[in-house]
Amino acid sequence: MKYDIIGDIHGCFQEFQDLTKKLGYNWNSDLPIHPDQRKLAFVGDITDRGPHSLRMIEIVWELVINKKVAYYAPGNHCNKLYRFFLGRNVTIAHGLETTVAEYEALPSHQQNMIKEKFITLYEQSPLYHVLDEKRLIVCHAGIRQDYIGRQDKKVQTFVLYGDITGEKHADGSPVRRDWAKEYKGTAWVVYGHTPVKEPRFVNHTVNIDTGAVFGGKLTGLRYPEMETVSVPSSLPFVPEKFRPIS
């Protein structure tokens, strides 16, 4: 099986459509379908900050749950939106406010449909995907070699948030260790979460979050070819979001 793994979309539907067309998908049925049966895989954070979060929920639900032709691994923004939809007390900030505003503008019956679709998508998707006979891992923020196969709380925190130290940067964002430098596994780990200006290959890991929602690019990785394909963002460039990884 051949896959096209898509970085953090964050509600950037137009960039997602542009990227999938560039990857050879057609949209004749209002969904990206590849003529050679390649499958899309999403590294999570499909919503928040960008203009079309609900459209992305509907597309990913349709591909993953209804048609079963794609894979989705949730990100930290997905986890927070899931908790919001469950009625938990979450802070509506850091991008969630844009998704909530879209949601609250809908009539109640459409709100219920979107909520049910996202809850189903989240609950029926694993924390990370192990594909191609264990040669490929698709996850949100990365995974240590010794965590592969585990689902416990420590692994969940790592996969959703990265290798956080507990410290904070001046802007309040968490300080993260560069786990990829220590990765010695043979499986390719394809992930996102931390915006980088260019796809970052370190050992057998690839970070494909090129900051589409921050004016960078939306990137896909073609597997097993290991080629990256990107399209430019239509949004303003926010340089401080592309912090050096340390």
From Swiss-Prot:
The keyword Oxidoreductase does not apply. Its cofactor is Ni(2+). GO terms for cellular component: cytoplasm. It holds the Pfam family Metallophos. Its EC number is 3.6.1.17. Keywords: GTP-binding, Hydrolase, Nickel, Nucleotide-binding. It comes from the Bacteria. Disulfide bonds: none annotated. It catalyses: P(1),P(4)-bis(5'-guanosyl) tetraphosphate + H2O = GMP + GTP + 2 H(+). GO terms for molecular function: bis(5'-nucleosyl)-tetraphosphatase (asymmetrical) activity; GTP binding; nickel cation binding; phosphatase activity. Asymmetrically hydrolyzes Ap4p to yield AMP and ATP. Belongs to the PrpE family. This is Bis(5'-nucleosyl)-tetraphosphatase PrpE [asymmetrical]. It comes from Bacillus cereus (strain ATCC 10987 / NRS 248).
